[in-house]
């Protein structure tokens, strides 16, 4: 398709780390595209939601380190995983998507382990962040599969280059595209996958300032 002039958006991992192709999150680096980009790579789902939240902060304050832990829906594995969860809940034997039960469990493995000890999912978070946001950011990632249908969650700890105030960051995020700030903790209002299901926004809770 690309050879005959069509523009192709590829959702697989085939082109993501290809040096000749751009890895695009529209809210983050969509302006990098030109009319000559006929194959556009789409990042991993966990990378997309993280960078939508972090890009505005990086632009203004400079991120030097990211520590991210993901709690990923079984839908990322596919229908077979949803069937496994439902079967286990109803005490029915069936095909297993994972090597272990997922009902009432958390599995610290998303995709295969690589020689460096990280899983492929964790390396996607690291490598894609470097390609899209900044190759100089130190990134540590942990990915966990949890018995949830419909939404990935992430806990992210940042080290910033410039000094900041929490209220300024909250204002920045609330004014950014693709982000819904939900941080009314006194009234128990915060992001949860059950309420994010079917929505496009990244639901965000900014909790604490460890600068001091």
For each feature predicted by the language model, list its residue ranges.
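Conserved small/polar residues in nucleotide/adenosyl-binding loops
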Residues: 206-212
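C-terminal hydrophobic structural anchor segments
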Residues: 178-196
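A common structural junction motif
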Residues: 168, 173-182
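Catalytic helix-loop patch of NAD(P)-dependent Rossmann-fold dehydrogenases
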Residues: 28-62
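Short, low-order "capping/linker" segments at domain edges
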Residues: 193-205
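Rossmann-fold NAD(P)-binding glycine/threonine-rich loop
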Residues: 2-35
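Active-site-lining helix/loop region of Rossmann-like oxidoreductase modules
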Residues: 48, 55-172
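General beta-strand structural signal in soluble alpha/beta enzymes
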Residues: 8-11, 17, 40-42, 67-70, ...
């Amino acid at each position: 398709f690309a050879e005959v002039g069509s523009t192709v958006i590829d959702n697989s991992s085939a082109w993501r780390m290809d040096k000749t192709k751009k890895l695009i999150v529209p809210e983050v680096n969509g302006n990098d595209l030109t009319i000559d980009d006929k194959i556009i790579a789409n990042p991993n789902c966990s990378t997309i939601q993280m960078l939508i939240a972090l890009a505005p902060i990086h632009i203004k304050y400079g991120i030097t380190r990211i520590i991210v832990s993901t709690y990923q829906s079984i839908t990322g594995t596919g229908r077979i995983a949803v069937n496994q969860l439902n079967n286990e809940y109803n005490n029915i034997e069936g095909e297993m998507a994972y090597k272990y039960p997922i009902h009432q469990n958390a599995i610290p493995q998303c995709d295969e382990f690589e020689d460096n000890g990280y899983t492929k999912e964790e390396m996607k978070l690291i490598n894609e962040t470097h390609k899209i946001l900044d190759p100089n950011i130190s990134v540590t990632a942990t990915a966990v599969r949890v018995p949830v249908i419909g939404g990935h969650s992430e806990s992210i700890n940042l080290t910033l280059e410039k000094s900041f105030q929490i209220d300024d960051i909250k204002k920045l995020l609330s004014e950014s595209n693709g982000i819904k700030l939900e941080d009314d903790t006194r009234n128990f209002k915060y992001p949860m996958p059950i309420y994010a299901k079917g929505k496009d926004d990244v639901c965000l809770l900014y909790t604490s300032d460890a600068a001091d």
